[in-house]
Amino acid sequence: AMGGEILGIAGIAGSGQKELLESISGLQKLEAGSKITYIEPDGTECLLNGMDPLDIIRKGLLLSFVPEDRFGMGLVGGMNIIQNIMLRTYRRGKGPLTDRKFPRDLSQKIVDDLEVVTPDINRTPIRRLSGGNVQKVLVGREIAQNPAVLMTAYAVRGLDINTSYVIYNLLTEQKMKGVSVIYVGEDLDVLLELCDRILVL
């Protein structure tokens, strides 16, 4: 995917769309003959084959992955939305020993963009949110990292139309900021409307 575009990934069930994203992010090992390269803005190439996710982070490669599974993906059930998103900014060196204000301000802006509908949004713990709201938070959490590449696997599966369009808008905003967005989806009409290019597996 190029910077400032949404690349759609489509294919029949079992063709490996989700596995492709897992391989890019280091969650799944590649078979021999495959090659995944991350190209820095200055043109420097970094081979990601077989690289552990933690090694990808240590190299400072700004890859973010929103998985299909909404449960157990690093969200802390007892924390509210802002606190969960702030945890992601801490990982980038914006933690309590450096600057507390920046991650909180960034997290608040992202929460506003997420359009989460729940009473007392700043106090409600994640575990009390609906599945659709949890999915919004998962997308917002990855956006908080200010990634160069944002990957989503079936980000709107099982969600209502309004929630789906909130997520589509978030992905489009990232594209407009120059982020490379890779979107795995099932709805061909959405892929054609949302994506600049589509890769069929």
Could you say what each language-model-derived stretch is?
Residues A1-L201:
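Glycine-rich phosphate-binding loops of nucleotide-dependent enzymes
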